[in-house]
């Protein structure tokens, strides 16, 4: 609605970029050309809140603000870099600190987590409800994982193929065969500092074991939660399992994940 009548061609092509499944884009910062330098909307952040991207909206907003504070906007057309690009990772780091300013966030976090052995979704939701109502669950969860001293691994799982199948699907074929069904895999894995120091992780794209609460929740309705005490030795790939390690798993079903 906002872009209509603004006479800015750049807005017209954004949906195509946001729909590109091979280069996930959550937002873009635009410097408008047909407006004065003193216009309040000279710089516009466009944030994709559709589907599973909705969970990242708060973080994406601060990511684009970080661009404005540092790299500014692309004057002609936004550059849609990969989320793994070093510049984008730097913007994520800035967004995480600016969006949850430490002198304000830390006292709230300490109060909410006082007496808790592990970081839980309940702690995250308590922080949102009490002090940061505009923050998304995911962004607040990331802010919490950066501050806990216990190893935490954030994981997103969805249907995907193993690397060999992906390569075959990317190769053009004379036959229009249907692709094999995907398996539930860990498509995004993020460690906090404590987990990195302890070498505690789950390899990206590893198949989620059927006995894990993550797998059991996948076909539930969105916003369904579950938790369990599990062992990393459940995770297996090509006949090899992860090193045995007792873990507490808390999972939430969201659209597409």
Could you say what each language-model-derived stretch is?
Residues 1-257:
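Active-site hotspot residues in diverse enzymes, especially metal/ion-binding acidic/histidine motifs
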